[in-house]
Amino acid sequence: MAVSGILGKKVGMTQLFDEKGDVRPCTVLQAGPCVVTQRKTAAKDGYDAAQIGLVEFVKESRLNKPERGHLGKNNLPPVRLMKEVGIVVDAAASEGNGDATKIGDRVLVDIFDGEKFVDIVGTSKGRGFAGVVKRHHFRGGPGSHGSMFTIAGSIGSSAYPSRVFPGMRMAGHMGNARITVRNLRILGIDKNENLLVVEGAVPGPNGRYVVISKAKKPPRERRGFSADTGPINPLKASKRLIKKKS
């Protein structure tokens, strides 16, 4: 399967212990199963992509008429969520010998076999109307008597500029925004349950839907650091290299 991403749901956070005994905070994601509902091609649409739907129990009456028609013409089951993800065009497809991605194909968590990092797009938790101290980490006013503790301060002088500049950090709605977290390390894959375990936090509360895709810019291995084993002692590494050469 040439699809580069999958739809999923945040299950929750837990922790794992690596070989050294260190604790690694991780997030468990329900990745799929999904089905390809539409195929975009460069010849017809100007770009290559696949529209996939998350196969989850949903009443057909919950879908609107365009969605029922879109899925019904290809005899596809009702899906909870539909998103567009990129695909990798195979060599056979580029030569005109056929396309590996077709409508009705299943997309499972096994698309991340051999991958070390993923990018995750989700919606952060909504915090409601928040002040500048909570929203922008302002210091606030002095703690003496008669002062406003969480005051924002001046937002613009009266003489000049006589206006508030665009983008001024002020109190307002906080959270409930689209957040992209890049290069989360994959710690485990459960193909039977379609579970994906990644290191670190994922935006949003438990049960919120996310888009999981292969890392666009995976980190390079720095000198003296291995992505699998962690920091490397350069002295011991050089001694091992000398032994191999001898």
Describe each model-derived feature in a short phrase:
Residues M1-S246:
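Extended basic (Lys/Arg/His-rich) segments that typically form rRNA-contacting surfaces
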